[in-house]
């Protein structure tokens, strides 16, 4: 097969591993910067051009689209889809997952347990918003934040009011969430490919922090997950219509709670921690699903 990887930086670990895994299995691979793709949208002859040339047909496309370029990145991916390329995560699913509010609404509607959460733009009554999620301590986040950026633990009511008021001054959407103390700064990252959790790690926050993101200096170890955690991770990915997802779970006294569903999970931390060839599993999923029937359905 001919496979395109959409990424702004082909030197990143995840891109290199996906390219390596695809080549090892006999496929041709090209890494394309989605921002350098430009599209001819024409009912008679749509096409995608890249750095002065018209791109050939790709059997499959692997999107590694960063949050900052979600709009144009998903538009480029959508053009590949319309030309009959199989996407490892469809553009609409990526856009849905990047919308934290919509994601939580969809997960809640499917009965997937979440931390008690309130979302507001400019709350007229900060005190009522705090009460709505059970009071302090609580976590205040910017809805648009990623990798632990724009996330604050407010341990007292006064601190919570101050943080919310400060975020409100940024004209930003605010997410207020109960703090799961018993998780002790740890979460579980489950890597889902299709209908299987192929790997799981426990991520621990660095000392003095509560954010377990590896980008923020957290540490990781292999996690043994329960059947309930496995089931909720698969259900969360399926709810978001993602074939590949990183599902972050907190272990609360009342059971596992889904924190986030990531549409473009990094492979470095979880592959190096577990020793599992996740990139290879992703390529094998593509081999099973990038069929002629898919291309005909999408118009390729």
From Swiss-Prot:
Any GO molecular function: identical protein binding
Query: What superkingdom does the record give?
Result: Bacteria
List the residue ranges forming a coiled coil, or say none: none
Q: Which terms in the GO cellular component ontology are assigned? A: cytoplasm
**Biological process terms in GO annotation:** protein modification process; SOS response; translation
Instruction: Fetch the Gene3D superfamilies from UniProt.
Output: 3.40.50.20, ATP-grasp fold, A domain, ATP-grasp fold, B domain
Catalytic temperature dependence: Shows thermal stability. Exhibits 86% activity after incubation at 55 degrees Celsius for 15 minutes, but its activity decreases sharply at 60 degrees Celsius.
Where do the annotations place Mg(2+) 2 binding? Answer: 260, 262
Residues that bind Mn(2+) 1: 248, 260
Query: What EC designation does it have?
Result: 6.3.2.-
Residues that hold ATP according to the record: 141, 178-179, 187, 211-213
Signal sequence annotation: none
The cofactor required is:
Mg(2+); Mn(2+)
Q: How is it used?
A: This protein may find application in fermentative methods that use microorganisms overexpressing rimK for mass production of poly-alpha-amino acids, which is thought to be the most economical and ecofriendly manufacturing process.
Quote the record's binding site residues for Mn(2+) 2. 260, 262
SUPFAM superfamilies associated with the record: Glutathione synthetase ATP-binding domain-like (SSF56059)
**What does the record say about pH dependence?**
Optimum pH is 9.5 for RpsF modification and 9 for polyglutamate synthase activity.
Annotated ATP-grasp domain ranges read 104-287
UniProt keyword terms in alphabetical order: ATP-binding, Ligase, Magnesium, Manganese, Metal-binding, Nucleotide-binding, Protein biosynthesis
Q: Could you tell me what the cofactor note in this record states?
A: Binds 2 magnesium or manganese ions per subunit.
Provide an example Pfam family for this protein.
Answer: Rimk_N
Give me the residues that bind Mg(2+) 1, please. Answer: 248, 260
- What's its top-level EC category? ligase
**What does this protein do, in the record's words?**
An L-glutamate ligase that catalyzes the ATP-dependent post-translational addition of glutamate residues to the C-terminus of ribosomal protein bS6 (RpsF). Is also able to catalyze the synthesis of poly-alpha-glutamate in vitro, via ATP hydrolysis from unprotected glutamate as substrate. The number of glutamate residues added to either RpsF or to poly-alpha-glutamate changes with pH.
Protein name per the record: Ribosomal protein bS6--L-glutamate ligase
């Amino acid at each position: 097969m001919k496979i395109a990887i959409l990424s702004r930086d082909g030197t990143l670990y995840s891109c290199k591993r996906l390219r390596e895994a695809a080549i090892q299995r006999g496929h041709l691979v090209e890494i394309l910067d989605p921002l350098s793709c430009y599209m001819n949208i024409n009912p008679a002859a749509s096409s995608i051009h890249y750095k002065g040339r018209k791109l050939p047909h790709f059997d499959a496309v692997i999107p590694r689209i960063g949050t900052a370029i979600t709009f144009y990145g998903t538009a480029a991916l959508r053009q590949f889809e319309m030309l009959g390329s199989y996407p490892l995560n469809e553009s609409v699913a990526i856009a849905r997952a990047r919308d934290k509010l919509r994601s939580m609404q969809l997960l809640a509607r499917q009965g997937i347990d979440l931390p008690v959460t309130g979302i507001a733009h400019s709350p007229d009554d900060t005190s009522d918003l705090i009460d709505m999620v059970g009071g302090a301590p609580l976590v205040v986040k910017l809805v648009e934040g990623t990798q632990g950026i724009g996330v604050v633990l407010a341990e007292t009511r006064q601190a919570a009011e101050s943080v919310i008021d400060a975020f409100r001054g940024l004209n930003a959407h605010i997410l207020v969430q109960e703090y799961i103390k018993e998780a002790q700064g740890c979460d579980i990252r489950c890597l889902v490919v299709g209908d299987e959790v192929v790997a799981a790690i426990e991520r621990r926050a660095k000392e003095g922090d509560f954010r377990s993101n590896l980008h923020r200096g957290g540490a990781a170890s292999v996690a043994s997950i329960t059947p309930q955690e496995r089931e909720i991770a698969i259900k969360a990915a399926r709810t978001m219509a993602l074939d590949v997802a990183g599902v972050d779970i907190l272990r609360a006294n009342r059971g596992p709670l889904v924190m986030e569903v990531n549409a473009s999970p990094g492979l470095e931390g979880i592959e190096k921690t577990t020793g599992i060839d996740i990139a290879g599993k992703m390529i094998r999923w593509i081999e099973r699903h990038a069929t002629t029937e898919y291309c005909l359905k999408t118009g390729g």
